Amino acid sequence: MAATEQDLRQEVRVWVTQNWDPSLSLREWRERLVTSGWAVPSWPVRWYGKGLPAWADDVVYDEITRCHAISHVPIGLAGPTILEQGPDLVRERFLRPLLTGEELWCQLFSEPSAGSDIAGLTTTAVLDGDEWVINGQKVWNTSAHHADLGMLLARTDWDVPKHNGITYFVLPMKQPGVEVRPLRQMNHHASFNQVFMTDARIPKDWVVGEVNRGWASALATLAHERRFGALGGPKLDGIDPGPALEQARAEAAEAARVYSWYPQRAGRVDLVIEYARSMGAADDPLIRQEIARLITMHRASQWTADRAKLARETGRPPGPEGSIGKLALSNVARQAAKVHSMISGTYGILAGDDPLAPLDGLLAEIILSVPAQSIAGGTDEIQHNILSERVLGLPREPDPLKGRPYREVRNS
């Protein structure tokens, strides 16, 4: 195996030259990547990797892209969680079809009464022979409408403190006991779903981690969610044209479609400056001051993303840079919307086909969507709590019910 980055790049280049064919389907190409170990080079050899240091991932993906081939595989949040938490039976069943894109996943954590406090969930799982029977409701579930499997948290023991009686399951989504309903938002999009489970069934062994100890696995997923949010998506520019690229673009478009309204679109500093110039507002000292503030926030966000990338390359578990990055993105989104609003004035609230609507109505959409950035993936308040406790060493918020069986807490 290559000892240096240069050797590694050469090895990858030789393999891609021998195996990349743009006429392949995306699934066929991913099968080759996964079989070779280049799909997830830092994963253990047993689990479709090369056993390389974490820094090798970015080197390999960069070199594959330089060879005009597709480097991205849909690792998602389930991939690293299952890899870390196991057990082997779950790894053997789910990791390969996850990496090839054969099976699509969604996250089933939040509930109507358990959002920021996910551990307060009330969805139940009761063992019935060789299956778990699931009853409850989840909410804010991205991609649940076309997912094959769900990362599900459910309560399996009510007579212990709330964090101790949770189990992390793999839920088959395509079954009679699972109903998915779109959730309409104030910006008129339905980017999320509600999922209702009525006597849904899960095989007994489809548990990530251990029964009643699913909170540790859930924390792993949430840490990866914050980190991946700072790292960005797949790079498809410069890829050889063909079926694989067309399918990869369609897949990326579908994944991005539910987020198309997200205020990251407003965080593009270049677009904000371009809009200010087009409206004759670029010389306004107040607007220039706010644009300067946006540029500062945006660069700080980029540096945080660089720290997240460095942490991953050095093999360090997800740390506070995920929460810092999440907060930075929220600040950038709000500031960008503020600048747009200052430039447009009251016209900014015009939407739809109104001929006076700025940016063809996109600005109104952004203004209505910005609050979501501070909520989705963990509220700003949750990120502040994480940083205060894990970075600054401040005491946790007092909880008079801590340590009591959750059954008593719910009835109190």
Enumerate the language-model features and the residues they cover:
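Alpha-helix capping/hinge segments and adjacent helical runs
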Residues: 50, 141, 323-412
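C-terminal helix-coil-helix/basic helical segment that borders enzyme active sites and/or dimer interfaces
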Residues: 24, 277, 281-288, 299-355
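Amphipathic, small/basic residue-rich leader segments at the start of a protein or domain
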Residues: 1-75, 83, 90-97, 104, ...
